[in-house]
């Protein structure tokens, strides 16, 4: 689906909270299911990579918004995936910026 949408869009902004919820079929509003809501799940990360690849093939950029964008444990992974932009709250900019500056993208 991302390949078809990329032909019509100027960019993709991946909402990771909703993506996680729908990919894993877990209602994030239900506290009984909290243990199943895993934004680091391989299926979620694979979906992000697939969207980024389709965006780039169509010549558009793909960014991350939602909680995962500010997750420093995934910043290098997102760089490796080719994510073009991370949308983060002001308090998370400096830690994310440091990781990006300290990462040699050519080694990923």
PLM regions and their residue ranges:
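Conserved alpha/beta-domain cores
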Residues: 1-108
């Amino acid at each position: 689906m991302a390949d078809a949408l990329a032909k019509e869009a100027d960019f993709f902004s991946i909402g990771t909270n909703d993506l996680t919820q729908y990919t894993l079929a877990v209602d994030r509003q239900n506290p009984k299911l909290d243990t199943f809501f895993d934004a680091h799940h391989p299926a979620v990360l694979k979906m992000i990579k697939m969207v980024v690849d389709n965006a780039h093939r169509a010549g558009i950029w793909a960014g991350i918004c939602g909680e995962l964008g500010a997750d420093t444990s995934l910043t290098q992974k997102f760089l490796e995936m080719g994510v073009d932009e991370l949308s983060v709250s002001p308090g998370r900019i400096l830690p994310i910026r440091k990781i990006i500056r300290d990462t040699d993208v050519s080694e990923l």
